[in-house]
Every structure is written in C-alpha cells, then in structure tokens.
C-alpha cells in the first residue's frame, strides 16, 4: 500500500466551494449538494442538498448547514455525477 501526500484541509475545502460534493457523516447519512461556503471551524453550507440512502436519493433538503465534527469525509463529485446547476 502506498502512502499519499497529506492535504491541508482548508485549501482543499475552499477549492471545492461552488462545486458539487458528497458529504458522509459519522452516523452513516450522505448528502449531495453544492458547497456554498466553509467557515474557520470547517462547518459547511450546502445548497440544493439531497439526502442519499444506499445509493439512491430519498429527499430534497434544499439549503443545509453541517457542523464540522459530524463529517466523516467530503469528496468532490464529477459534473456527470451531479444533475442540475447551483441555484440561489
């Protein structure tokens, strides 16, 4: 197994701002949406958020604020993976 280079999380998250992301919480929930902003504590604001359970979308939540200590991971999604565009 090869070790990857460590990534500073703040520039990584700032680079994802305005892009579609998938956020998985420690408790198993997954949310897809557009990352609107990240604060100094790494709390995240998502727009056009959808809840994903077992790979399928179960509901549209709209705008969501996720507290930093609940996040297991966040990953950027390809434009092909996310339908629609960011709306205000």
UniProtKB/Swiss-Prot annotation:
GO biological process, one term: mRNA splicing, via spliceosome
Chief subcellular location: nucleus
Keywords: Cytoplasm, mRNA processing, mRNA splicing, Nucleus, Ribonucleoprotein, RNA-binding, Spliceosome
SMART domains named among the record's database cross-references: Sm (SM00651)
Location in the cell: Nucleus; Cytoplasm, Cytosol
GO cellular component, one term: cytosol
Domain Sm span(s) in chain numbering: 8-80
The keyword Cytoplasm is assigned to this record: yes
InterPro entries: Lsm6/sSmF, LSM_dom_sf, Sm, Sm_dom_euk/arc, Sm_F
One Pfam family from the record: LSM
Keyword Ribonucleoprotein annotated: yes
Gene Ontology terms, MF aspect: RNA binding
Quaternary structure, from the entry: Interacts with the SMN complex.
Similarity comment: family membership: Belongs to the snRNP Sm proteins family. SmF/LSm6 subfamily.
Function: Plays a role in pre-mRNA splicing as a core component of the spliceosomal U1, U2, U4 and U5 small nuclear ribonucleoproteins (snRNPs), the building blocks of the spliceosome.
Protein name: Small nuclear ribonucleoprotein F
Biological source species: Drosophila melanogaster
Gene this protein is translated from: SmF
